[in-house]
């Protein structure tokens, strides 16, 4: 009964944990690394074709984004997640594949002129579509059994529509251990979705620490702030441009604007228009509306029961096609434009910035975190000019930020979550935080609450039955010199072939004991395949 820590160790992104228990091999989360990497991540120590299943906490790419990649390498097992997470992953993984293929096409056009080797995306649309078929929707609070001796319960983590903490109970050799994976723990009193559900019993806890060293402070009045920005901008004849993450944050903005319109907080501008210019955001909003009763909080449900859609209001316009998007720029009325991506590094928001950033009447309102190195970060730090589509654009618009808005619990919320466990767990593993933050939070858990805690590096292996560390890895810093080049398309195809060969061997090993006539037919199929491809001209 072992756990190996793969990703989001001393880093925020790339969540992935590999478990061997009750004769099964499986993952909890399979996330993509995003932003700068500081430490090398251990590869999953098994051929993906040998994995039995995956448990998924939620749909964000840093938790789900590598699922198509392991599918491409042979993983064909079920992926258990809440129903809302299954629906969001359907659109988000396809969107991720589209972005990667588009980026590869762009880089290869540029690279061919410079004689550079071909850039290959991590996975294709075919891989994304394939893995989506393997999702198994699970209700909150109901125990499921993905394999004998393994039971799983999803409880609401309050971070994103469908997000969950996972309670995993394993029975092996007459012993039972309960492991809780926090997933991303939500901030209290977020609009629309419920607060996180506390758990009370676990032998081991793997918990996030994104804000493990800081408090969000007093909650601002978001509706008042947004009303003031819109009123002030419209009064001078401008428009409000909101770069926003398509899933989660966009729906929160719609929730706030519905209230602003209902309470007539913006005066003198009639039924002003609000454009949501993001196909992904529009699809996500539809999914939010499909999961009102299982995911919405009491305030949102109260609106629904009155026949009010919390995400709809007069003046709301959605744009799907590129022509729809371009047409917005010809609308000279004062308006609000909500568009992705939230950090302004991709998507239709860049076109809206090109058309609106120069005009001092307009306001660019940031409603989410802006990572170092992004266009959004440059704007909030006071850039006077920026490059957009090869052109220099002067920053004349007012740049504003909505303070304190976060989908993650702060340090106080994290402490309250872990304190809810009645008996102290044997061990708490602190992950999903910046390098120093994981160590700071682990020490705080030990010093203030008396918990046995550690912040493991990628590659650390822990024996859950013996409560002992089998191997404690050390962080290996990434340097530019050690960064491996992207494999060529031919190399990637060969790697996939090798992966399929390894999966075939796995199936062969599992076939021992089946009827002889089936074994004989299986052998003939393999013989025929070998005869077809074992040629001198290959």
Labelled PLM ranges:
Residues 1-55, 64, 71-252, 256-273:
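His/Asp/Glu-rich metal-coordinating catalytic cores
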Residues 94-99, 103-107, 221-223, 256-261, ...:
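Short secondary-structure boundary/capping segments
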Residues 100-105, 292-306, 387, 470-492:
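A polyampholytic, Gly/Pro-enriched intrinsically disordered region
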Residues 150-154, 287-295, 415-416, 465-477:
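Short, surface-exposed amphipathic charged segments that create phosphate/polyanion-binding patches used
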Residues 229-374, 386-387, 437-439, 444-447, ...:
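Hard-cation-handling environments
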Residues 359, 434-479:
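C-terminal, active-site-flanking charged/polar segments
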Residues 387-418:
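Generic long, charged, amphipathic alpha-helical segments
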Residues 459-518:
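Charged, amphipathic alpha-helical linkers/stalks
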